[in-house]
Design a protein with these regions (language model features):
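Short helix-initiation/N-cap motifs at beta->coil->alpha
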Residues: 2-5, 9, 13-23, 120-131
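A conserved helix-loop-strand patch within extracytoplasmic ligand-binding domains
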Residues: 49-110
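Paired acidic/hydrophobic, glycine-rich loop segments that form the ligand-binding mouth/hinge
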Residues: 14, 31-36, 137-143
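Glycine/small-residue-rich loop that forms an oxyanion/phosphate-binding "nest" at active or ligand-binding sites
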Residues: 32, 39-57
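Conserved small/polar residues in nucleotide/adenosyl-binding loops
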Residues: 158-164
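BRCT (BRCA1 C-terminal) domain core and associated BRCT-interaction motifs
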Residues: 146-151, 155-157
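Short active-site oxyanion
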Residues: 10-12, 29, 93-97, 118
Length: 168
């Protein structure tokens, strides 16, 4: 969809999907756009390097949530998670699997908290089901309300608040 600004015939407004805004800013076919910072962080590094974030806006807040299923009642903190991750490595001879649609944000967050013994599992959707199907031990996802996570009954025990929408 295309819009315009009255008395500004040289300006065209394109209504695009938030992910497409990032792609087009990166390839130079857009001059300015509004999109989620999470999408920028998940884009290719060469795209990230081409985009200048101008201003943080005060809407569209979302959290990157690390969530575990209820049976893991002994995991209450990130330190507990790191301990479990080492147990997986030492006793089960495998890494703790984390299902996510946001590998860059997840990796950066877990590393920043000292959790290093994990393997990312790419999710294309219904991430909250991965622990129940045996595909991962825990998940990370972006949420603003937490409704989907609550509906699927995992316990959310830590989160990282992502920056709100920005002009890029």
């Amino acid at each position: 969809m295309i819009g315009s600004i009255k008395n500004k015939s040289n300006i065209k407004i394109l209504y695009l999907h938030a992910r497409e805004i990032i792609e087009r800013l990166g390839d130079g076919s857009l001059d300015i756009g509004f999109s989620g910072f999470d999408l920028l962080k998940e884009s290719e590094i060469n795209t990230q390097n081409k985009i200048n974030v101008i201003k943080k806006l005060n809407f569209g807040k979302a959290n990157l949530v690390v969530a575990i299923p209820d049976p893991w009642i002994d995991v209450q903190t990130i330190a507990d998670l790191e301990e479990i991750a080492f147990e997986f490595r030492d006793k089960k001879k495998k890494r703790l699997r984390v299902a996510t649609k946001y590998p860059n944000l997840t990796r950066d967050f877990l590393f920043s908290k000292g959790v290093t013994q994990f393997k990312l599992v790419d999710s294309l959707g219904a991430t909250e089901a991965y622990p129940f199907t045996g595909s991962a031990e825990l998940i990370t996802d972006i949420t603003s309300t937490g409704e989907t996570l609550r509906a699927n009954n995992p316990v959310s025990y830590t989160h990282l608040t992502l920056p709100t929408k920005r002009i890029v």
